[in-house]
Design a protein with these regions (language model features):
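A short secondary-structure junction signal
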Residues: 49-51, 85-90
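Flexible helix-coil transition and linker loops at the boundaries of alpha-helical arrays
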Residues: 22-30
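General structural concept
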Residues: 18-19
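Amphipathic alpha-helical regulatory regions
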Residues: 1-6, 11-15, 29-51, 69-74, ...
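Short helix/strand-bridging catalytic loops that position acidic/His residues to coordinate divalent metals
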Residues: 4, 54-63
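C-terminal effector modules of eukaryotic transcription factors
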Residues: 63-82, 89-243
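Short, solvent-exposed coil/turn linker segments
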Residues: 52-55, 173
Length: 243
């Protein structure tokens, strides 16, 4: 994006942020659709700006992720209002992420290589997170949602949408996100498989450069002894570490 246009976009965004931020603590049926749209556009704004060193969407190497706070704020807006009552036909394209029925994912079999990769991920979790491990519930839940997103995304790859992909990040637990932020290797591996789904959105210009940026950050945070588990996600994203 040309520098002049980028400066103008930032001015408009900062003005909108000043107007909308005070309302986020006072969500009502009359403003929730507008606030939901604002939060959605704000998340897209971060993507459009492009990746910054050390910022990995759901965790930053230099502090908390402001993008994640905004993205998860979408859930808070949904919970504060009954979207079924306030949603108008013209606002249907911004239906809440929680409305996407992952449980109704088609039963169509995945490509054998993808299925094998997901099974390898499940094995990694079983080996590294035992049944009495306090991390297990959040990890298994994240894996379950991820499988459903993969099924939807790979069933009609030409029609994969950001709603399908980011519904995973919308549904994972706060505990799982804390584990990612603590650079837990199992949580990082799950995140790397999510990055593969983001790769499928690269037809949208604002997603360009994000998959390789995220994968390189995950690789840097992964313990040396477990980096080989990232082989499949790295291959799918098209990123390899420098020699």
């Amino acid at each position: 994006m040309p520098v002049g246009l980028l400066d103008k976009a930032n001015v408009h965004w900062e003005e909108a942020l000043k107007l909308a931020s005070p309302l986020l603590s006072r969500v009502t049926e009359s403003n929730c659709a507008a606030l939901y749209l604002f939060a959605t556009i704000t998340c897209l704004h971060t993507f459009a700006l492009g990746p910054c060193p050390g910022e990995l969407l759901i965790f930053n190497q230099n502090g908390p992720s402001h993008w994640l706070t905004l993205f998860r704020g979408l859930r808070s807006i949904e919970q504060a209002c009954d979207f079924a009552k306030v949603q108008k036909e013209e606002l249907h394209p911004i239906f809440p992420l929680s409305g996407l029925e992952l449980n109704n994912a088609p039963a169509k079999a995945l490509d054998p290589s993808v299925q094998e990769a997901l099974e390898a991920l499940a094995s990694f979790i079983d080996i590294n997170v035992t049944k009495d491990d306090e991390r297990r519930e959040s990890m298994v839940e994240a894996l379950t949602h991820l499988r459903r997103c993969y099924t939807l995304a790979y069933d009609e790859p030409a029609q994969v949408s950001a709603y399908t992909v980011f519904s995973w990040l919308h549904r994972v637990s706060d505990q799982y996100l804390k584990l990612v932020q603590a650079t837990d290797p199992v949580a990082l591996l799950l995140f790397s498989y999510f990055v593969v789904l983001i790769k499928g959105l690269e037809c949208a210009w604002m997603v360009k450069d994000w998959p390789t940026h995220l994968m390189s950050g995950i690789y840097a945070c992964m313990p040396l002894s477990k980096r080989f588990w990232l082989s499949w996600p790295m291959e799918q994203v098209g990123w390899l570490p420098a020699e």
